[in-house]
Amino acid sequence: MGSAVRIAMVAGEASGDLLASHLIAALKTHLPDAVFYGIGGPKMQAQGFDSWWPMEKLSVMGYWDALKHYREIAGIRRQLKKRLLDLKPDIFIGVDAPDFNLGLETNLKAAGVRTIHYVSPSIWAWRGGRVKKIAKAVNRVLALFPMEPALYEKERVPVTYVGHPLADIIPLQTSKQAVREKLSLPRDYPIFAMLPGSRQGELAMMAETFVETAKIIRERHLPNAMFVVPLATRETRLQFELAIYNRQAGDVPFRLLFGHAQDALGAADVSLVASGTATLEAALIKRPMVITYKIAKFSYWLMKRMAYLPYVGLPNVLAGRFVVPEILQDEATPENLAEALVKLYEDKENAEAVEEAFTEIHLQLRQNTAEKAARAVIECLN
């Protein structure tokens, strides 16, 4: 293996950007001269990654959103495929974004480029038949969750269980009072974290519902409640501010943070979280939460028809049971969400049971992920 190893990568959203940035950092300790290029976000770029298109171009949610942006995304994939086939990198790593990456990986593998898919698609939840497509696309899958390797081994797809980097990063115990002090929040007030998502499409669906939920909690249940809202980008912050204006909630004490999701979750008694990686962060910080989500009606209908499991939130999937409530789609009214959040806030016994279940998950996922993943990549290169 020559010294300047060329590693192409594609990440499609914030969670993939985080995973890939840790992997790049770990790979650089083994391969200091390696070059990294493709499509990635700000965290990857901070590690020296050369992103040819903005990652946001690939961040779509649900079938309807994907259809609306199909032409643009297909154009990017076509140009990217041509460029990568011309450059022939030593290895290609698709980070999540299976609908974009698997087809690309299939083409590259057929042309002799080694391919890895980092983050197994949710074949345990729906569309399990994808495992056959994955087998054609990749030389190896890097799986984040402990129930995944067996599904690949059954189909003779090389797989490495690497755990989840958030489990390495987040300490096993987080002091609520220490985080409140850091954020200058009162020690004894009811505090709710609200995580409406990281993408603009999610905010468009969820922001006003979250704001209205906060209003109801203050007006009908806990008049001194406060709400901490971490937002990933300037655009999503503006969307949330607009939702506050639209719902006439200027008097509700929202504390909007740029990023700092873990601080928001750590300071909170209870969290309201839009389904996704943020639910895993909330679980690792071990606070009770309500998981919620709204997507386009057609996308939801399709997913319900194809789903294998009764739950969608990662914490419940990993526990194999409903540890925390899920209030989805038409059920996700501000009244229902407020009632569920207040109920969790008042049930201290349940908070202890939740902490116990989430500690078990944390220990399972804590695997020194970035290093394990880097070693699997190097093994594939050799």
Swiss-Prot record:
Signal peptide: none annotated. GO terms for biological process: lipid A biosynthetic process. One of its GO terms (molecular function) is lipid-A-disaccharide synthase activity. Keywords: Glycosyltransferase, Lipid A biosynthesis, Lipid biosynthesis, Lipid metabolism, Transferase. It comes from the Bacteria. GO terms for cellular component: membrane. Coiled coil: none annotated. InterPro entries: Glyco_trans_19 (IPR003835). It holds the Pfam family LpxB. It catalyses: a lipid X + a UDP-2-N,3-O-bis[(3R)-3-hydroxyacyl]-alpha-D-glucosamine = a lipid A disaccharide + UDP + H(+). Its EC number is 2.4.1.182. Pathway: Bacterial outer membrane biogenesis; LPS lipid A biosynthesis. Belongs to the LpxB family. Condensation of UDP-2,3-diacylglucosamine and 2,3-diacylglucosamine-1-phosphate to form lipid A disaccharide, a precursor of lipid A, a phosphorylated glycolipid that anchors the lipopolysaccharide to the outer membrane of the cell. PANTHER family: LIPID-A-DISACCHARIDE SYNTHASE, LIPID-A-DISACCHARIDE SYNTHASE, MITOCHONDRIAL-RELATED. This is Lipid-A-disaccharide synthase. It comes from Dechloromonas aromatica (strain RCB).
